[in-house]
Amino acid sequence: MRKFFSMRFPSPVSVQWLADFLGAGLVGDKNGQATGINEIHKVEQGDLVFVDHPKYYDTCLRSAASYIIINKAVEVPPGKAILIVDQPFEAYLRIVHHFRPFEPAAKMISDSAVIGRGSYLYPNVFIGHHVTIGSNCLIHPNVTILDHCVIGDNVIIQAGTVIGPDAFYYNTKKDRAVWYKKMASCGRVVIEDDVEIGAGCTIDRGVTGDTIIGKGSRLDNMIHIGHDTVIGENCLFAAQVGIAGAVRIGNGVILWGQVGVSKTLTIGDNAVVLAQSGVPSSLEGGKIYFGYPAEDASVKKRELVWIKRIPELWKKVMAGRPEEGRPKAH
């Protein structure tokens, strides 16, 4: 079972310090130590989260998160603390920018990057700050690997691919001039061992956690993987597959060309989705799917056969009706 990492602070941070830093009211366990900041769907003990809508108060308070930035005084569960501010989203941004500040790049390969033995980088490869690349990797021209991303051993990345751009993820409020405010992305991309990624792909970093490509997987050209998506081992994706954010894909999954996968769903182990299918909801493993919405391929193909026969069947139906009962042409 994979462990999903949040953005960790360099060392545990006093919740009292956080309250002072944010100018927040502090209620609950005032002696706690926050270890990192995370999203609500994958928090763990010691994590800090924010919530700014009553709809999600209860979810946050009942989650594993130890510390909640919130915009209303509420009853605090035992062992937790809340930090009360007017704008929790802005407080989240302040914390992220403090612990993960912007670092200008002065070189094509950062001095803080670690590159393993036997790895070869073609000309015009950009390697950001605090990137780790394993042994015996081959990174083709014009690849960009942005800050804090992790590349395993024996990985091949073809030309023009970008690893670690910001998540397409926004705080949305329509009562302000700018409806969509950018969520600062402080997560990573982790490419495990023995992965090959084709040309012109983009793999977004997690908002606070990791986007993961599992060991032995193969990605064709021009594929997009959204933030916080976790892809299992030995998966095979053909060209122009698009996967939205926070998707969980099992081991041995095959997605053929131009398959589109919607956000926050799960595809089970060894599922196969045929070309140009759309996946709007979770799929069980071990089956072959086709169409939009993607369904069992054998059922979908039979449906298509019957759809093609509609004109023929319509003629037969009309041929058996009396003249006065037939619909009139307009």
Predicted regions and their residues:
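Terminal amphipathic alpha-helical/low-complexity segments used for targeting or macromolecular assembly
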Residues: 1-107, 111-112, 154, 160-161, ...
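Structural signal for interior beta-strand "rungs" in well-ordered beta-sheet cores
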Residues: 50, 107-296
